[in-house]
Amino acid sequence: MESTIGIDAGGTLTKIAYLNEKMQLAFEKFYSNEQNKIIDWLKQNTGKKQICITGGKAKQLQQLLSNSYKIVELNEFEATLIGVRYILKEEKYDINNFILTNIGTGTSIHYVYNDQYIRAGGTGVGGGTIMGLSKLLTNLEHFEDVIPLTKVGSRKELDITVGDIYGGILSPIDNSLTASNFGKAATIESNYNSSDILATVQGLVGEVVTALSLQFAETKNIDHIIYIGSTLCNNIHLQNIISSYTKYQNKIPIFLQDGGNSGAIGALLHVANKKS
């Protein structure tokens, strides 16, 4: 397996999984439009001879690499599921029945039962939405710049909550729940800043993704929802939104360490398992 690389070429990011000199699982990450950087990295790692590639931009990258490497292509969700099962085992989870929500550029949701899986649905709301709205509203272009500001932002000046609508009157549902994302921006003079906008954008995305995941979990009578994707990496604000909403509906949220690399891990393991 030390001569093999797993690559997940996504719409926004390309993730690479491989074994380093200490035979430890290691990762690299590039923007998918930085193909020259990806190729340069591969050239520097001369011991790598075989690539298993997956993801939406797999074909595009494969065309650039096919003359230099032996390449195996793997279905995107099969790769992700192999990676998720590996991480679950590493983190001592014993779960075979779950909803898997992958928040990438958009969001894909699958129902997993033992070795079977069904695509439940998805939404165009995801990491691409966060970055697109962040650019439009605050002119920030990079995820690494958005996250620190999000941590200090507040949604109180922009979101309308159930409590805002009912005032002091007893409401039929929790007063803290969001009644309208960004609703205050259209109705009153709000004292908000860029950090508040960024926090509210993530609130919108987190609640949409979680609401869909919860609907599918309820339909299938599933308790565990596993949330993965690079959008969650170092993004405590988004994780907290998803976690609190999931728990409020009496479901169990799980965030896997290195979950954003599950596709690349799965691609790497797919070839390794075939060799063994």
Curated annotation (Swiss-Prot):
Job of this protein: Catalyzes the phosphorylation of pantothenate (Pan), the first step in CoA biosynthesis.
Gene: coaW
Species whose genome carries this gene: Bacillus cereus (strain ATCC 10987 / NRS 248)
Cellular compartment(s): Cytoplasm
Quaternary structure and partners: Homodimer.
Catalytic residues in the record: E76 (proton acceptor)
Class in the EC hierarchy, top level: transferase
Assigned EC number: 2.7.1.33
The protein's name in its UniProt record: Type II pantothenate kinase
Positions contributing to ATP binding: 8-15, 105, 127-131, 143, 230
GO biological process terms held by the UniProt record: coenzyme A biosynthetic process
Entry annotated with the keyword ATP-binding: yes
CC annotations in GO: cytosol
Catalysis: reaction(s): (R)-pantothenate + ATP = (R)-4'-phosphopantothenate + ADP + H(+)
Family statement: Belongs to the type II pantothenate kinase family.
Keywords on record: ATP-binding, Coenzyme A biosynthesis, Cytoplasm, Kinase, Nucleotide-binding, Transferase
HAMAP family for the chain: Pantothen_kinase_2
Pfam families: Fumble (PF03630)
Claim: Transmembrane is one of the keywords in the record: no
GO MF assignments: ATP binding; pantothenate kinase activity
Biological pathway: Cofactor biosynthesis; coenzyme A biosynthesis; CoA from (R)-pantothenate: step 1/5
